Amino acid sequence: MTNLRKTHPLMKIVNSSFIDLPAPSNISSWWNFGSLLGICLIIQILTGLFLAMHYTSDTMTAFSSVTHICRDVNYGWLIRYLHANGASMFFICLFLHVGRGLYYGSYMYLETWNIGVLLLFAVMATAFMGYVLPWGQMSFWGATVITNLLSAIPYIGSDLVEWIWGGFSVDKATLTRFFAFHFILPFIIAALAGVHLLFLHETGSNNPSGLSSDADKIPFHPYYTIKDILGVLLLILVLTSLVLFSPDLLGDPDNYTPANPLNTPPHIKPEWYFLFAYAILRSIPNKLGGVLALVLSILVLAVVPFLHTSKQRSMMFRPFSQCLFWVLVADLLTLTWIGGQPVEHPFIIIGQLASILYFLLILVIMPITSLLENNLLTW
């Protein structure tokens, strides 16, 4: 008798995706982050659902409702901090996942990569709107500053901003619509992640060597299911440690002050995972130029596959490209640090240099280095 998992219409989809899927035998722990992102998304949707049961999206009561969740709801504090720090874990996994793709040349699977870039934008939009919901000082001023950037768009800018606000400032209408979008977007992200997997399974996974692994495949279950479970346990260990020992480590103290349109905080800054993009935005004195640089800092990932000049897919056997990759990582860490600093000397010039280096590395230096490495192969 044929196994039910191979014949049942629903089970065979699961079977071909997670059980009998042929996977390369040599994929390292860097390939764990896809499943970790899936777990993060599930955690965020579940904790978010329970938070939404007690939250009110009204400017008068939003801040109080979050306080009520933390004080009066059974384990409300736990749900709230799991959700807030779950977002940080989500972005850590995202950045490592994208970094893995850049290092090992996974971007050569164009459809998978482009949907990944789209997913990155969707997750960033969701996180931004979620940060506005507690209606603290940084929520309000962060929303005001970032939405105001759209006014830099020629001709339609100011109308567009008022349309998004639903009035002449960030107010009740803005909060209500942000809550609605913040609730629906994770489900769109889940659907996109399904398409991401669909395209990935058309080609099969890449592997550290960047070479074809058709000659050496192993079944996903039990080898990679057990490996993924280890990754999930480590993720949960880090997340629970963060939530139970220092839940406010990655947050901003200003967000414990209720939103006040008449009082601007001394340093307006987003959550840590947006600081690199915020630093690039601030590095350009022109408003429109800054907005373009902000968008391009992520959109540049979509161009990477077309700038692949190497004869080899992965960086595993390319020492010069490896060095440049780690310079890029250091540059992004520098930008993250600068994004959290006040706009004064020497931080301004450091931010500008780091921003220029970021784009130069991806668009110019790395492709040229790959060409030089090609010549070294024939030398």
From Swiss-Prot:
<dbReference type="Pfam" id="PF00032">
    <property type="entry name" value="Cytochrom_B_C"/>
</dbReference>
<dbReference type="GO" id="GO:0046872">
    <property type="term" value="F:metal ion binding"/>
</dbReference>
<dbReference type="GO" id="GO:0006122">
    <property type="term" value="P:mitochondrial electron transport, ubiquinol to cytochrome c"/>
</dbReference>
<keyword id="KW-0496">Mitochondrion</keyword>
<feature type="transmembrane region" description="Helical">
    <location>
        <begin position="77"/>
        <end position="98"/>
    </location>
</feature>
<feature type="binding site" description="axial binding residue">
    <location>
        <position position="182"/>
    </location>
    <ligand>
        <name>heme b b562</name>
    </ligand>
</feature>
<keyword id="KW-1133">Transmembrane helix</keyword>
<keyword id="KW-0479">Metal-binding</keyword>
<feature type="binding site" description="axial binding residue">
    <location>
        <position position="83"/>
    </location>
    <ligand>
        <name>heme b b562</name>
    </ligand>
</feature>
<dbReference type="InterPro" id="IPR005797">
    <property type="entry name" value="Cyt_b/b6_N"/>
</dbReference>
<dbReference type="InterPro" id="IPR016174">
    <property type="entry name" value="Di-haem_cyt_TM"/>
</dbReference>
<feature type="binding site">
    <location>
        <position position="201"/>
    </location>
    <ligand>
        <name>a ubiquinone</name>
    </ligand>
</feature>
<feature type="transmembrane region" description="Helical">
    <location>
        <begin position="226"/>
        <end position="246"/>
    </location>
</feature>
<protein>
    <recommendedName>
        <fullName>Cytochrome b</fullName>
    </recommendedName>
</protein>
<feature type="transmembrane region" description="Helical">
    <location>
        <begin position="178"/>
        <end position="198"/>
    </location>
</feature>
<feature type="transmembrane region" description="Helical">
    <location>
        <begin position="288"/>
        <end position="308"/>
    </location>
</feature>
<feature type="binding site" description="axial binding residue">
    <location>
        <position position="196"/>
    </location>
    <ligand>
        <name>heme b b566</name>
    </ligand>
</feature>
<feature type="transmembrane region" description="Helical">
    <location>
        <begin position="33"/>
        <end position="53"/>
    </location>
</feature>
<dbReference type="InterPro" id="IPR005798">
    <property type="entry name" value="Cyt_b/b6_C"/>
</dbReference>
<keyword id="KW-0999">Mitochondrion inner membrane</keyword>
<keyword id="KW-0812">Transmembrane</keyword>
<feature type="binding site" description="axial binding residue">
    <location>
        <position position="97"/>
    </location>
    <ligand>
        <name>heme b b566</name>
    </ligand>
</feature>
<dbReference type="InterPro" id="IPR048259">
    <property type="entry name" value="Cytochrome_b_N_euk/bac"/>
</dbReference>
<dbReference type="InterPro" id="IPR027387">
    <property type="entry name" value="Cytb/b6-like_sf"/>
</dbReference>
<feature type="transmembrane region" description="Helical">
    <location>
        <begin position="320"/>
        <end position="340"/>
    </location>
</feature>
<comment type="subunit">
    <text>The cytochrome bc1 complex contains 11 subunits: 3 respiratory subunits (MT-CYB, CYC1 and UQCRFS1), 2 core proteins (UQCRC1 and UQCRC2) and 6 low-molecular weight proteins (UQCRH/QCR6, UQCRB/QCR7, UQCRQ/QCR8, UQCR10/QCR9, UQCR11/QCR10 and a cleavage product of UQCRFS1). This cytochrome bc1 complex then forms a dimer.</text>
</comment>
<keyword id="KW-0249">Electron transport</keyword>
<dbReference type="InterPro" id="IPR048260">
    <property type="entry name" value="Cytochrome_b_C_euk/bac"/>
</dbReference>
<dbReference type="GO" id="GO:0008121">
    <property type="term" value="F:ubiquinol-cytochrome-c reductase activity"/>
</dbReference>
<feature type="transmembrane region" description="Helical">
    <location>
        <begin position="347"/>
        <end position="367"/>
    </location>
</feature>
<dbReference type="InterPro" id="IPR036150">
    <property type="entry name" value="Cyt_b/b6_C_sf"/>
</dbReference>
<dbReference type="GO" id="GO:0045275">
    <property type="term" value="C:respiratory chain complex III"/>
</dbReference>
<dbReference type="InterPro" id="IPR030689">
    <property type="entry name" value="Cytochrome_b"/>
</dbReference>
<comment type="function">
    <text>Component of the ubiquinol-cytochrome c reductase complex (complex III or cytochrome b-c1 complex) that is part of the mitochondrial respiratory chain. The b-c1 complex mediates electron transfer from ubiquinol to cytochrome c. Contributes to the generation of a proton gradient across the mitochondrial membrane that is then used for ATP synthesis.</text>
</comment>
<keyword id="KW-0813">Transport</keyword>
<keyword id="KW-0349">Heme</keyword>
<keyword id="KW-0472">Membrane</keyword>
<dbReference type="GO" id="GO:0005743">
    <property type="term" value="C:mitochondrial inner membrane"/>
</dbReference>
<feature type="transmembrane region" description="Helical">
    <location>
        <begin position="113"/>
        <end position="133"/>
    </location>
</feature>
<comment type="similarity">
    <text>Belongs to the cytochrome b family.</text>
</comment>
<keyword id="KW-0679">Respiratory chain</keyword>
<keyword id="KW-0830">Ubiquinone</keyword>
